[in-house]
Every structure is written in C-alpha cells, then in structure tokens.
Amino acid sequence: EKLRQIEASNMVLEKEPVDLLELAQAVKTAFEPELAKKKLTCMVTGESAIISGDQKRLHHVIFNLVSNAVKYSTESGQILIDIHNLGKNVQLTVKDQGIGIPKEDIPLIFERFYRTDRSRNRKTGGAGIGLTIVKAIVLAHGGNISVESVKGCGSCFTVVLPKN
C-alpha cells in the first residue's frame, strides 16, 4: 500500500525543520539491541544539519539504510552514519563493511522488488521495496541518492538533500 501511494506520486510531505544529525542519532539508538546482538559498532559523525523536510519520511530513509547496513554486515563490522552541510545541501552517508553489492546489480537496486541474491530472501527477509521507497522519498524532497559498493567490501549510500 505504501509503495502504491508513492508510485502514484501521492506523497504529501509535511515539511518542518529537521536536524538530520539528531534523526540519525535517534535511528542509531533504535538499532542498539540489533547492533549488540551482531557485535556491530555504529558511529554517527558530522555536524548538525537542518533541512526543511518531512521528519517521519526522512526517519524512514535513514532507518531503512541503517537496517540494510545491519542486515548485510558481518559480525563485528562497523557502520558509519555521517552528516555534513554542503552549501545549500546536506549530505548523509551510511557506510558499512558488509557483503557489498555486485557491480552488475548496482543500477538495479532501487528498482521495485529487486533482490541482488534471491537465495537470501529466507535468511534476511524483506520484499525488495525498501530502497525503492527510500529513493521515492529522497526524490520527493528534491534530492538524490547514489551508492558505491564492492562485493565483499561493503557499501556506501549517499543521500544529498536541499536545505529548503
């Protein structure tokens, strides 16, 4: 249902001042039990960065990116969430040391229901729509999202959002 609303471009943003650094810290706190279970370290670095955005939807973006980082990280790995002001924009990166994404799959990961390895469905769960929703929310805010990854060496998702 959520995906249908987003695809129909019915996303109404309830904009207010949102500090992405505070939001990232709140998401990290929500993941503490899972981080401890997998012996993962998660650090939030950077600076306070306030944008005009929909707090609930931006929380969803960070939550989904961190969820994927936790899900695909190997035990004792590290996850880094970094927030920086870049002129009229804010850059958010979520970097992990997980299993990475094969090069040929990178152009497809934001597609609806796409899974890089269907054999993982049972083990890691998920319907393959998380990144599709994340991308739609980022685009609705006038931003963009990209990923750099090397299979076996982790992934780095970068979101750039306008401050206004």
Where are these regions (language model features)?
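Conserved micro-motifs of the catalytic ATP-binding
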Residues: 8-13, 46, 50-53
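Short conserved segments within the C-terminal catalytic ATPase subdomain
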Residues: 9, 34-44
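A conserved beta-strand-to-alpha-helix junction within the catalytic ATP-binding
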Residues: 14-29
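Short helix-loop "hinge" at the ATP-lid/N-box region of the Bergerat-fold HATPase_c
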Residues: 69-70
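Short beta-strand/loop element within the Bergerat-fold HATPase_c
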Residues: 76-88
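Short conserved segment of the HATPase_c
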Residues: 101-115
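Conserved glycine-rich
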Residues: 142-143
